[in-house]
Regions:
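Extreme N-terminal starter segment of soluble prokaryotic enzymes
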Residues: 1-4
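Active-site environment of divalent metal-dependent phosphoester hydrolases
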Residues: 10-13, 51-54, 85-96, 117-118, ...
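Binuclear metal-dependent phosphoesterase catalytic core
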Residues: 121-126, 130-144, 250-323
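Core catalytic region of metal-dependent phosphoesterases/phosphodiesterases
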Residues: 19-128, 227
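Conserved catalytic scaffold of divalent metal-dependent phosphoesterases
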Residues: 104-218, 255
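Active-site neighborhood of phospho(di)ester-bond hydrolases with catalytic His/Asp-centered motifs
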Residues: 6-7, 43-48, 81-88, 108-115, ...
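Accessory, non-catalytic peripheral segments of nucleic-acid enzymes
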Residues: 42, 276-422
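Conserved beta-sheet core of the metallophosphoesterase superfamily
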Residues: 103, 203-205, 209-280
Length: 422
């Protein structure tokens, strides 16, 4: 079985007031080309399809058109199965509703994890519905033979997994839920077909390069042992830096995001091609690079010659910047006082007529003494946060102890307030 693994698309992201639709279209054109050339049996998207739980109409149209385009591309070689799971940025319930239609296109969308008043194992009807939703037989088309199995675990807060054993703490619920699904797969997988587990979560020990440690550090994380051993490849989403997980012998990997989400994500971006012959065999993994339409560029005064490190010394670099080079630009300046009041206007004037997109000035005050042990965020970092991410930093217990659907209600409230303020 050949799998195309990708994640963290973040469709609909606005970056410093710049719309990124063109960049996402550029990615999807590359993805269609990869599908055409690699002819995968399965396209697996491990969460964060959208950047927000209330995506715009334009973002939803781009998602739908791109998904149909990928499916149509696969028809030339007999089709491919598509499996998508919700990430922490997505509306899990909305994805579930959309999935009712997508299933007719050989596509499974797994948004939420079912709950019931009676979650004991004696409730056979409940767990039959759980197995039907989260254990997905992979078929190139709806009439073809089974090639393998996907066990799909969307983003879910620990306390919102089914309470299979009342003695479990909330951190144990996820592990027991996954074990239950893998045991069921082992029962039905009598032909020794490959088993793929996919989840959108933070795995302990992951390289979080590009993510703000303050934000990521406040999220629930799971060690590799949480996922058991009844799978051949663990397809992960959530962390944008592509990597294999330590201790997994190369079987567990983050594909990473296809385009950079911030200036710290100035590394190469990929999708993974994974090939597995049968259950128990080592997966063969290849990374296929994705070319960003706009690169992230930081021009820093630190890199200028001594004696020429003022904010004004960066302006000639902007005047001489290649006119047709598509980049987002961040300036890093070293200043002890306030910037000149017309500095930003000078920056924008220097880039007039160029395709470079100015974003921000990051001001660092040299040798600034520490002001305490509390966490702090720069204005730029605050501006890049969503309201939910900011709330999770300020009041993490609010989300950790909340019932299923609370986060989406919070997002909807933010959206409604935004509409009233327009």
């Amino acid at each position: 079985m050949k799998i195309l693994h990708t994640s963290d698309w973040h469709i609909g992201q606005t970056f410093y007031d710049y719309d990124r639709t063109e960049e996402h279209k550029h990615f999807f054109e590359q993805l269609k080309k990869i599908v055409r050339e690699e002819k995968p049996d399965l396209l697996l998207v491990s969460g964060d399809l959208y950047h927000t739980s209330a995506p715009s109409i334009a973002a939803q149209e781009l998602y739908n058109e791109s998904m149909l385009g990928l499916r149509d591309e696969s028809l030339a070689f007999g089709g491919m199965h598509i499996v998508l799971i919700a990430g922490n940025h997505d509306s899990s319930s909305k994805l579930d509703v959309d999935g009712l239609l997508w299933k007719y296109f050989n596509t499974n969308v797994v948004g939420t994890i079912p709950r019931d008043n009676d979650e004991s194992l004696e409730n056979r009807a409940f767990y039959d519905s759980v197995f039907a939703k989260h254990i997905i037989p992979v078929r190139k088309n709806r009439e073809s033979e089974i090639l393998g199995y996907v066990v799909a675990i969307p983003h879910c807060y620990p306390q919102n997994f089914p309470n299979i054993n009342p003695k479990d703490g909330k951190q144990d619920r996820m592990k027991r839920f996954i074990a239950l699904l893998l045991d069921k797969v082992a029962e039905v997988n009598t032909d020794g077909l490959p088993v793929i587990l996919t989840a959108h979560t933070l795995v302990t020990g992951s390289n979080i390069k590009g993510h703000d440690a303050i934000i990521v550090g406040g999220l629930d994380n799971s060690d590799i042992g949480t996922f058991g051993s009844g799978w051949d490849y663990l397809a992960l989403g959530h962390i944008h830096f592509p990597q294999e997980i330590k201790g997994s012998n190369g079987r567990a990997r983050y594909s990473g995001s296809p385009i950079p989400m911030n200036f710290e994500e100035d590394y190469d971006h990929f999708v993974n091609i994974v090939e597995i012959e049968k259950r128990g065999e080592m997966p063969q993994v290849r990374q296929i690079p994705i070319k960003s339409l706009y690169e992230m560029v930081t021009l820093s005064a630190k890199e200028l010659p001594d004696g020429k490190r003022s904010c004004m010394d960066l302006l000639p670099l902007l005047h001489n910047f290649p006119p047709h080079k598509k980049v987002y630009i961040r300036l890093e300046v070293l200043e002890t006082g306030e910037l000149p009041p017309d500095y930003i206007q000078r920056v924008k004037t220097a880039l007039t007529g160029k395709e470079a997109r100015y974003c921000l000035v990051k001001q660092e005050i040299p040798d600034k003494p520490a002001e305490g042990e509390g966490l702090s965020l720069t204005a730029a970092q605050v501006g890049a946060l969503s309201p939910r991410e900011m709330a999770e930093i300020i009041a993490p217990d609010l989300f950790e102890e909340a019932e299923e659907g609370y986060a989406e209600l919070f997002d909807q409230a933010v959206t409604n307030v935004g509409k009233q303020l327009r």
